[in-house]
Curated annotation (Swiss-Prot):
Disulfide topology: C53-C69, C60-C73, C68-C77
Species of the source: Conus imperialis (Imperial cone)
Keyword vocabulary terms for this entry: Cleavage on pair of basic residues, Disulfide bond, Knottin, Secreted, Signal, Toxin
Recorded domain comment: The presence of a 'disulfide through disulfide knot' structurally defines this protein as a knottin.
Pfam families: Conotoxin
Signal peptide: 1-22
Name of the protein described by the UniProt record: Conotoxin 6
Keyword Chaperone in annotation: no
Prosequence residues removed at maturation: 23-51
Length: 78
């Protein structure tokens, strides 16, 4: 009985999740929250893209190090 109830709740939750996250081809990006819409129009504006990168003047190591925010490295981030 408990297992059946848990399965029903899980199926309802997953069904609701699918409808919430489904793409609406007519409205496109209009239904997304403002911040997410801005990040989709300009992916470089996302805070996640800058996570772990080093600012200019910090030690990085080798040329073209991906850890630099600018992407350029010559012992220090440029």
């Amino acid at each position: 009985m408990k297992l059946t109830c848990m399965m029903i709740v899980a199926v309802l939750f997953l069904t609701a999740w699918i409808f919430i996250t489904a793409d609406n081809s007519r409205n496109g990006i209009e239904n997304l929250p403002r911040m997410r819409r801005h990040e989709m129009k300009n992916p470089k504006a996302s805070k996640l893209n800058k996570r772990g990168c080093r600012e200019g003047g910090e030690f990085c190591g080798t040329l073209y190090e991906e850890r630099c925010c600018s992407g350029w490295c010559f012992f220090v981030c440029v």
